[in-house]
Structure formats: C-alpha cells, structure tokens
A protein has these predicted regions:
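Conserved amphipathic alpha-helical core elements
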Residues: 39-40, 113
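Beta-alpha-beta core module
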Residues: 153-159, 163, 178, 230-279, ...
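Secondary-structure junction motif
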Residues: 189-216, 283-287, 291-292, 297-309
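Central regulatory/effector-binding core of bacterial HTH transcription factors
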Residues: 90-153, 226
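Short helix-boundary/capping micro-motifs
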Residues: 11-31
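A short LG(V/I)-centered, amphipathic sequence patch enriched
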Residues: 40-59
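Hydrophobic hinge/microswitch elements
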Residues: 128-133, 137-141, 146-147, 204-262, ...
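Flexible hinge/capping segments at coil-to-helix
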Residues: 155-195, 202, 285
Length: 327
C-alpha cells in the first residue's frame, strides 16, 4: 500500500468527488481512480460507492478512514519535526476555535503570539465544538479551543477557563425596565441559540442553554435556532428573543447599551473552555508557547491587570494623595 493511495482516498472523502480530489492533488481523474483501484485491491474491499451525486463511503471505507487520517497526520507531524530542526521559528500552525470564543481576551493572546513568532503563519478556523475536535483529530488543526472536555482518548484536553454565561435582552425590551425579576417573567419568552444536535455530537454551548432553561422550569421555552453568534446578538438587539451568552462575547454590546443583562441568578450558567491537541502530535516550540499563553486565560487579562496596577498605585500613594499618572 502506497502513501499516495491513502492521500487520494482522504482527498476524495474531503472533496466529495474524484474530480475534486484530482484538483486538490494536481492529478487527473484517471490517475486518482487508478490509486483508488490499487487501494481497494490491497484492502480486498471497495471503499467507495459511486452514485449519480458523487461518491459515498462503503462500510469498509468508513472503517478505514480514521486510520488513513491518522497516518497522514503523523506523516505531516514528522515532516514538521524535521523542518523545525533547521528553522524552529518558521512554518504554519492552525488553531481551530468555537466562534463564540473570539473575544478580546483571546485576540490579545493571539496578537502577542504573532509578535513573538512573526515567521510562524498562524491560521484560524471557526467551527462548532465537535467540529473543532474533528479538525484536531485528523491533523487539520494543531490546537483547538472548544467547550467541554472531549472524551476521545486520542485527544489531550486541558480546561483553561470557566466562562460565565448571562441572560440578556434588548435595551428596549420590557424586561430591561424591570428592577425585580423572577423566572415566572420568562414563561412566554423565546430564546436564540445555535441549532441543537442531539447525541454524542451535540453542541455543549446549546446543551448548556437548554439545561439551564430546563433547570429553571423553562424547559418548554421556544428556541430560535441561529447558526451565527453575530446574527444571534442582532436578533436579540432587535427584540426577537432573549439570549444566554458568554459575558466575553457581549462585552461590547453591554458597554454600548444595546443589550442589557437580566438579574436572574437561576438563569446564569458557566461552561468550560478546553484546549485540545492530538495525544501523539508533534508540537513545535511555537505551538507549545501558544498552548502556554492560552492556558493562562485568566492570569493576564489586560483589563484586570490595569485595574490591579491602579489599585496597587493608589495603595502606595496613601490617603489624600493621587496615584501617579492619574489626573
């Protein structure tokens, strides 16, 4: 069995056709077909079923796919390890993240990383939690940030942050004007969330929202499925529902006054932010540095650090004296 046969097999799966795989590999369609014929001969089983709409995996193909992806990922790791011997601060690295995590805390760390490693090309991909795991598992991403621990033993998971989630509404929503609220005020309200996916592939973010509503006695509440965080926030701002969002993802809207938090403790929640990588993956020095930065999520928040510095300065200045640098 040759490596180019496995490359062709995985390319067809990801591109959905022999033609697409040929374009990705710079091969003619007959050349791709020849490689698959040889692979199927080696396996003594067909890996694809040809249909009018393209191709789909056979049972043998589905069984072979994770091993093929692992083999290719290991090969790419080996190439990266050898290249790093001569050029340790060069190369490319992909970080896959859940879109709701693209907060000022994360972007500050990514800017610092780029400043420290200007010759490393850092690529970002956004996806749902289960998709982040899949990108890391098959080697398309070096590191991933997702919600909740993935039980897959092939992935190393490290909880780096516990994100607070708060209920919010539009500034002009009737609930925003009420000082005292209890759960009964939400009986007829709709909520926006990412589309639910049941079973093992369910999105932890959506499951957390549904679980919190159910625990508060609102299990029958209407959920408006919207697959974009930005669209969710715009819908809530327009009054088309309420949201249960990570605080970091609505920080700007809360400061601008277009969204208001709802002071109902029963509807507050937390969700773990988890950093993942493949258990046997090669991690360059740059990747390890990024892991360290992401693992210190709560340690060096610029806004918290500024507040701490000002507090210490006031303490040193003593009563009746201004801290340096303050007008």
């Amino acid at each position: 069995m040759e490596l180019d046969q496995i490359e062709a097999f995985v390319a067809i799966v990801r591109r959905g056709s022999f033609t697409g795989a040929g374009a990705a590999l710079a091969l003619s369609q007959p050349a791709v077909s020849r490689r698959i014929d040889l692979l199927e001969h080696e396996l003594a089983a067909p890996v694809f079923e040809r249909t009018r709409g393209g191709v789909r995996l056979t049972e043998a193909g589905r069984a072979f796919l994770p091993y093929a992806e692992t083999l290719l990922a290991s090969m790419h790791d080996g190439i990266a390890a050898v290249r790093a011997l001569e050029r340790p601060d060069h190369g490319a690295m992909t970080l896959a993240i859940v879109g709701t995590l693209a907060s000022t805390t994360l972007t500050a760390r990514l800017r610092s990383f780029r400043a420290a490693y200007p010759r490393v090309e850092l690529r970002l991909r956004t996806a749902l939690s289960r998709e982040v795991s899949e990108l890391v598992r098959r080697g398309d991403a070096t590191l991933g940030l997702r919600y909740d621990v993935d039980p897959d033993p092939e992935l190393v998971c490290r909880t780096v942050h516990r994100e607070k989630m708060v209920p919010v509404c539009a500034a002009m929503h009737p609930l925003a004007r009420r000082r005292a609220l209890d759960v009964s005020a939400f009986r007829r309200e709709a909520w926006v969330a990412f589309p639910a996916r049941r079973g093992a592939g369910g999105e932890p973010y959506t499951l957390t929202i549904e679980g919190r509503l159910a625990a508060a006695g609102l299990g029958g509440a209407e959920i408006i499925p919207i697959d974009s965080l930005t669209a969710q926030k715009r819908m809530v701002e327009a009054g088309f529902g309420l949201g249960l969002f990570p605080v970091s993802s609505v920080d700007e809207e809360l400061r601008a006054g277009t969204l208001r938090t709802l002071p109902v403790r029963a509807l507050q929640a937390t969700i773990d932010v988890v950093l993942i990588h493949r258990r046997r993956a090669y991690l360059s020095g740059a990747a390890q540095s990024l892991m360290t930065a992401l693992s210190q999520w709560d340690v060096s928040d610029p806004r918290r650090a500024t507040r701490r510095r000002r507090t210490r300065a006031r303490s040193r200045a003593g009563p009746g004296r201004r801290a340096p640098g303050r007008a």
